[in-house]
Amino acid sequence: MGAMAQNPPNLRPDLAPRLVIDSPRREGQPTIGMVSLGCPKALVDSERILTRLRAEGYAISPDYAGADAVIVNTCGFLDSAKVESLEAIGEALRENGRVIVTGCLGAEPDYITGAHPKVLAVTGPHQYEQVLDAVHGAVPPAPDPFVDLLPATGVRLTPRHFSYLKISEGCNHTCRFCIIPDMRGRLASRPERAVLREAEKLVEAGVRELLVISQDTSAYGTDWKGPEKFPILPLARELGRLGAWVRLHYVYPYPHVRELIPLMAEGLVLPYLDIPFQHAHPEVLKRMARPAAAARTLDEIAAWRRDCPEIALRSTFIVGYPGETEAEFQTLLDWLDEAQLDRVGCFQYENVAGARSNALPDHVAPEVKQERWDRFMEKAQAISEVKLAAKVGRRIEVIVDEVDEDGATCRTKADAPEIDGNLFIDEGFRGLAPGDILTVEVEEAGEYDIWGRPV
């Protein structure tokens, strides 16, 4: 019986790793395994499920052999993600035999049971109670759970020094290529008090970096219809006062995003914006049902940089969207030249079951999509290389992620875990530990990573 795989599925540039977790157990204690696939938002769902199970006295197994049953939290955003999820379910069935499926792909139970009829149960995304009911049916809880085994912060699947902080569920946008609103529903923001309470507990437990996530972070709180027009602003300000790094992900490019920039200039929030622009040509954006103001976006980027010169901008793009012409793609390349984004991810368009974009005319041939992806990433890499070379000789603050006998792997304020680059320390790293924050002088730069020494 093998250990559960921990390698990233590598389906999209912004996917979280495939993770498992271990916990102490006592003889006869009911034990559950967890395989978590997909984005950081799914990772938070896995953490919540495991926290509830630990509170009920379940132990968590890092391998199939030690588990009484295995939960597979799936991704179903792209067809390739669905294939990866089915493979993970099949592996869990072969190695353990008792499998409960949850997550985004769980919204298509017939698809799962058609491929794997022996799964014990299938539940959809963030259906925590249904998952727990399925676990109780498969592996009854111990009569006297040891609640004191549960850490104050709950079960977490990230390293101890950083944590994802989910502030809302769902999305109100109707992008033609996306089925997330169908899977996760409309926007439902968590109360600010609940978010801050969770963040405070995390920081008290030693978390040095909070990664704020949702489907649409800049829309946080707009579903309340209250007097505050931009509720993410006071939330970000309060999070920034906790003393940890605060990094904002999935910020939709609304005009009022500019109000966040002063918080970055003041140092309350990291000077980093993860904004999914998706494309730059107005006609492509219109076919995507996205805002089509590329020129205004460039003006906004210039204003952000004027108000906070240290800001790092990350974005993701789709190439080969149905109907995309060579001229439209060239507009995207030209826009990227002007925007000079710091970090860029890109994937080739593919149909997703249930997406309205499937019915659009003039789908782009696979070889053309690949060729455009290659050209796009070549330009993005060249921009990254120049930007990183400009950091050589500068002193910057970094957070340590890992330390081994060869050195320390760190990140700058411009780099989120898993999706961005690293700063490596090859000398003078003895005594460093994950979560340490220190100043480093940059000595060398590559295409996506930099090297430095402590000062």
Swiss-Prot record:
[4Fe-4S] cluster 2 binds at C171, C175, C178. It catalyses: L-aspartate(89)-[ribosomal protein uS12]-hydrogen + (sulfur carrier)-SH + AH2 + 2 S-adenosyl-L-methionine = 3-methylsulfanyl-L-aspartate(89)-[ribosomal protein uS12]-hydrogen + (sulfur carrier)-H + 5'-deoxyadenosine + L-methionine + A + S-adenosyl-L-homocysteine + 2 H(+). The keyword Cell membrane does not apply. It is found in: Cytoplasm. [4Fe-4S] cluster 1 binds at C39, C75, C104. Its cofactor is [4Fe-4S] cluster. Disulfide bonds: none annotated. Binds 2 [4Fe-4S] clusters. One cluster is coordinated with 3 cysteines and an exchangeable S-adenosyl-L-methionine. It holds the Pfam family Radical_SAM. GO terms for cellular component: cytosol. InterPro entries: Elp3/MiaA/NifB-like_rSAM, Methylthiotransferase, Methylthiotransferase_N, Methylthiotransferase_N_sf, NA-bd_OB-fold, Ribosomal_uS12_MeSTrfase_RimO, rSAM, rSAM_horseshoe. Residues 389-455 form the TRAM domain. Its EC number is 2.8.4.4. GO terms for molecular function: 4 iron, 4 sulfur cluster binding; aspartic acid methylthiotransferase activity; metal ion binding; protein methylthiotransferase activity. One of its GO terms (biological process) is tRNA modification. Keywords: 4Fe-4S, Cytoplasm, Iron, Iron-sulfur, Metal-binding, S-adenosyl-L-methionine, Transferase. Residues 30-140 form the MTTase N-terminal domain. HAMAP family: MTTase_RimO. Belongs to the methylthiotransferase family. RimO subfamily. NCBIfam families: 30S ribosomal protein S12 methylthiotransferase RimO (TIGR01125), MiaB/RimO family radical SAM methylthiotransferase (TIGR00089). This is Ribosomal protein uS12 methylthiotransferase RimO. It comes from Cereibacter sphaeroides (strain ATCC 17023 / DSM 158 / JCM 6121 / CCUG 31486 / LMG 2827 / NBRC 12203 / NCIMB 8253 / ATH 2.4.1.).
